[in-house]
Design a protein with these regions (language model features):
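Conserved SAM-binding motif I beta-strand of class I
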Residues: 69-75
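A short acidic, Gly/Pro-enriched loop at the edge of an enzyme's catalytic core
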Residues: 109-119
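Conserved class I S-adenosyl-L-methionine
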Residues: 46-55
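Conserved SAM-binding loop of SAM-dependent methyltransferases across substrates and taxa
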Residues: 56-68
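Hydrophobic/aromatic anchor residues within beta-strands of the central parallel beta-sheet
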Residues: 70, 99-101
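Conserved alpha-helix/loop element of class I SAM-dependent methyltransferases that forms part
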Residues: 27-46
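S-adenosyl-L-methionine-dependent methyltransferase catalytic module, highlighting the catalytic core
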Residues: 3-30, 54, 75, 80-82, ...
Length: 253
């Protein structure tokens, strides 16, 4: 992986996003480059990738810009996304991303069996109001033999939560998002590492890996949190159970 080249390409894509969204997406570039490295490692150009629940982020369009054939599945109904969805999805389409608008918790994935090299879902399953089990099994069924599944989620027992919850601070969602909106789309249940390993066993994945990172701290509004993240991140990577963001990478048997 040429990290500098990838970073430059993803930053150029972020600059094409409308208005303030460009700044928001630019802050996400390090996370997106890391996610791309998990998904694309060792793949030849032209490999097929599906991203489930990727929304308007840079992952799918970034993978397409790097030469992959990409399908993005999402309902795009997050409140803040609706006014800008069409403009951003046009950027995706120009680079060849196939857009499949659907709520995967209610509608089955419309994938042919054994048709994808990699399927990913980042920061999505914790929002689902139905069990993710059925959809995850559909993802594995759509992978080619030896295909890669990558799941990224927030860690419900990361170090920050272990420190702040005893102090009475640790709400997952704002009152406005939970109480005032017609449909709650926040976090329903955040997993931990034991949950990811449970999923891996249920899906019969092989060669599984668990990784940890701490992306949220880098873009926190709190300067002390940003500084603490910079100082602690390299150490915490060795202890994924304490990290804010955890990943499962596994392969279809």
């Amino acid at each position: 992986m040429n990290g500098i080249s990838w970073t430059n390409q993803i930053e150029s894509l972020a600059a094409q996003y409308p208005g303030d969204e460009a700044c928001k997406q630019r802050r996400e570039v390090p996370r997106i480059v890391f996610n791309l490295s998990l998904a694309l490692d060792g793949l030849p150009q032209g490999s097929r990738i599906a991203d489930i629940g990727g929304g308007l982020g840079l992952f799918s369009v970034g993978a397409a810009a790097l030469g992959m054939r990409v399908t993005l599945v999402d309902d795009f109904q997050d409140r803040e996304n609706i006014p800008i969805a069409d403009a951003i999805l046009n950027i995706h389409r120009r680079l060849g991303v196939e857009i499949d608008r659907r709520d995967v918790t209610h509608d089955r994935l419309d994938f042919e069996p054994a048709s994808f090299d990699v399927i990913t879902t980042f920061d999505s399953i914790e929002h689902w109001h139905a069990s993710p089990k059925g959809v995850l099994h559909q993802m594995v069924a759509a992978l080619k033999s030896g295909g890669r599944l990558v799941i990224g989620v927030p860690n419900c027992v990361n170090l920050r939560k272990r420190l702040t919850v005893p102090l009475g601070r640790g709400k997952w969602s704002s009152m406005a998002d939970w109480y005032e909106q017609p449909t709650f789309r926040g976090h329903v249940r955040e997993p931990d590492i034991s949950d990811l390993l449970y999923i891996a066993r249920d899906l019969k994945l092989t060669n599984t890996r668990i990784l940890g990172r701490n992306w949220a701290g880098y873009v926190s509004a709190s300067r002390p949190i940003r500084i603490a993240t910079i100082l602690s991140n390299r150490l915490l990577r060795h202890f994924p159970t304490l990290c804010a963001d955890i990943y499962l990478v596994g392969y279809k048997s």
